[in-house]
Amino acid sequence: MAGDQMHVLSALDSAKTQWYHFTAIVIAGMGFFTDAYDLFCISLVTKLIGRVYYTADGASKPGSLPPNVSAAVNGVAFVGTLTGQLFFGWLGDRVGRKSVYGMTLLLMIICSVASGLSFGDTPTSVMATLCFFRFWLGFGIGGDYPLSATIMSEYANKRTRGAFIAAVFAMQGFGILAGGAVAIGITAIFRSRFPAPPFAADPAASTPPQADYVWRLILMFGALPAALTFYWRMRMPETARYTAIVAKNAERAAADMSKVLQVKITAEQAEMASPVDKPFTSKPFGLFSGEFARRHGFHLLGTTSTWLLLDIAYYSQNLFQKDIFSAIGWIPEAKTMSALDELYHIARAQTLIALCGTVPGYWFTVALIDVVGRFKIQAAGFFVMTAFMLALAVPYDHWTAAGNQIGFVVLYALTFFFANFGPNATTFIVPAEIYPARLRATCHGISAASGKVGAIVGSFGFLYLAQSPVPAKAAAHGYPPGIGVRNSLFALAGCSLLGFLLTFLVPEPKGKSLEEMSRENEVGQP
């Protein structure tokens, strides 16, 4: 792309920050709000679902989901997300970002409501219905990853691009807090309206019939914020970079951007800016071409592997916070509480950890990513996560002893803080900045799907890996013997350390245009 062809894209890169940028953050971020809300809430309500559907008459302890059912409920949404990331990433490059953007949000709205309406004559059929709708919910959420990241990167100016993409991702923080607030609020209402004794006092009465409505209402509420932004998402124009570079309609690109951004672009300037009307010395290369491998092969290896390793560590802990809290004594023993009391205590504990550790990390990234840079934040985040996991694992017996649990929780919260002020944010941001426009959503989708493979490994593997190595103790929970929580933390520390090393494959996009990073601005390059 010759220098005089860069006029329009340079105008977008240098455009001042304005109100539409913030509007786009909210519109694009609703998918991540729903993603985090669903992930947070499903880890809460699985305990309640176990009590409602799997408590046997005469049992000495409250019911819980069988291992295979728990793995399916927790993991099926990840399988859907992975599939959606690959499909909608490819489709976003094929037919345009805007063309499919509304489809993902509509899927989230419908399937969030449908998850709460899961039906069946037996517990197995209810769980099968829930898993079906959670797969398609994940499919819609997955599509939002490459589309939202790509749209925000192509709207933003290069000076604050990292902060804008990070802010979209940081909507997960609001989703987490909303999940906690909704769960606490609904549970508090039902507890006061339908008081129940602890399981130890009266097993049957400890789970009132109305508890079956609680988990359904919590899951369904996730559809509301997405529904409120659907209209505005459908009104968003296609990005200028896609329209001019990929769709070859420079005049439309100029008109669209002039409507929403305070950038004056004439049709003549847009035509000059479109690289499609100029001869190139080489043909456009595809994803599986040798030219792509030469230019971006190591980049793709870096973005996929670091996201994979981050999500193994992140989701292994995030999905099962409630079990860790119970193990260290932060949540009372299940049989000393009613079903709604247990949900209330778990929701309160997880919300406190999110408020103190998880959510602030997102906004530290927003504030500092365009100052410090992506590479430094990601490398430092992986390194500090490794250190904190080792600090949890080495003296694990000390942390689980009576009186020391608060120290464990503080280190645990700091681990999440540096995950979010670190690789959890940067692995999402960088793939939207370093690949060519015609492959940008596809490559982001591939990177994100790799991350979800890690989440699947974490969500399925941690159920078994963290079980006690003593067969009798593991069997009491319905699992085969594992390696224990302590050794699992050592394994997760190893994943974080490897992520730190592989970060060196990822380039630094701070302060550079998208065309500079993808090398689309080079003379003779497509």
From Swiss-Prot:
User: Which stretches are Cytoplasmic in the membrane topology?
Assistant: 1-24, 92-99, 144-163, 233-296, 373-374, 431-445, 510-526
Q: Where in the cell is it found?
A: Membrane
* TM ranges: 25-45, 71-91, 100-120, 123-143, 164-184, 212-232, 297-315, 352-372, 375-395, 408-430, 446-466, 489-509
GO molecular function terms listed in the Swiss-Prot or TrEMBL record = phosphate transmembrane transporter activity; symporter activity
Topological domain, Extracellular: which ranges?
46-70, 121-122, 185-211, 316-351, 396-407, 467-488
Principal subcellular localization: membrane
**GO BP terms in the entry:** phosphate ion transport
Describe how expression is induced or repressed.
In roots by phosphate starvation.
PROSITE patterns (UniProt xref): MFS (PS50850)
Membrane topology annotation: Multi-pass membrane protein
Question: GO cellular component terms?
Answer: membrane
Does the UniProt entry include the keyword Oxidoreductase? no
Q: What are the alphabetically sorted keywords of the record? A: Membrane, Phosphate transport, Symport, Transmembrane, Transmembrane helix, Transport
Q: What is noted besides the main data?
A: Although related to the sugar transporter family, it does not transport sugars.
What family does this belong to?
Answer: Belongs to the major facilitator superfamily. Phosphate:H(+) symporter (TC 2.A.1.9) family.
NCBIfam families attached here?
Answer: 2A0109
Relate the protein's function as given in its record.
Answer: High-affinity transporter for external inorganic phosphate.
Q: What is this protein called?
A: Probable inorganic phosphate transporter 1-7
Species per Swiss-Prot/TrEMBL record: Oryza sativa subsp. japonica
| Organism classification | Eukaryota, Viridiplantae, Streptophyta, Embryophyta, Tracheophyta
Gene name for this UniProt entry:
PHT1-7
